[in-house]
C-alpha cells in the first residue's frame, strides 16, 4: 500500500465516521446554550429588582420593562433550545440580548476584535447565529415535527454551483 492510498483510506474512514456523528455538534451546542439561558433567565426572573437596578445603571432604556422581558426571553428561549422546538426563532431574541449585553455591560472591555472575540457573550452570539442559520439538528422536536432541517435540504436557493454536486 502506498502512502497516498493509506492517507486516502484514513481520510475516507474519518470522513465516514464524522458524517455518522454530524448530529452531535448541533445537539451539544443547542442543549449547552439552552441550559445556560434557562439558568440565567431563572435567576433574573427571581431577582427582577436587582436586574432592573443593574439595567438602570447601564443606561438601558425602560429598565422596568426590559428586565422582565430579557428574563423571560432567556428562560423561555433557553427552554425551547433545550427541547429543540422553534430553535431558529428562539435564537433570534437571544442573539439580541447578547448584542445588547456586549454594547452595554461589556462596551468598555472591547477595544478591538480580539477583545470582542474573547467575550463569552460573543461566543453565545456566534453559537446562536449558527443555530438560527443551520437549525437545531436531527435530534430535536423541530426535526421530528417538521422533517428535514436546512442543513439536510438541498441548496435550492443557492443554485447547483453550491449544492456540492457537479453540474
Predicted feature locations:
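Short juxtamembrane and helix-loop transition motifs at transmembrane-helix boundaries
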Residues: 48-60, 88
Amino acid at each position: 500500500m502506498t502512502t497516498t492510498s493509506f492517507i486516502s483510506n484514513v481520510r475516507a474512514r474519518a470522513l465516514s465516521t464524522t458524517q455518522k456523528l454530524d448530529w452531535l455538534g448541533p445537539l451539544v451546542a443547542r442543549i449547552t446554550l439552552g441550559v445556560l439561558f434557562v439558568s440565567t433567565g431563572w435567576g433574573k426572573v427571581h431577582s427582577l429588582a436587582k436586574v432592573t437596578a443593574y439595567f438602570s445603571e447601564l443606561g438601558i432604556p425602560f429598565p422596568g420593562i426590559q428586565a422582565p422581558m430579557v428574563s423571560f426571553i432567556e428562560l423561555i428561549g433557553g427552554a425551547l433550545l433545550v427541547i429543540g422546538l422553534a430553535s431558529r426563532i428562539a435564537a433570534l431574541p437571544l442573539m439580541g440580548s447578547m448584542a445588547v449585553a456586549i454594547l452595554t455591560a461589556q462596551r468598555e472591555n472591547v477595544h478591538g476584535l480580539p477583545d470582542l472575540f474573547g467575550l463569552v457573550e460573543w461566543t453565545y452570539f456566534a453559537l446562536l447565529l449558527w443555530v438560527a442559520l443551520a437549525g437545531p439538528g436531527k435530534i430535536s422536536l423541530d426535526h421530528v415535527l417538521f422533517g428535514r432541517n436546512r442543513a439536510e435540504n438541498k441548496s435550492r436557493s443557492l443554485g447547483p454551483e453550491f449544492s456540492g454536486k457537479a453540474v
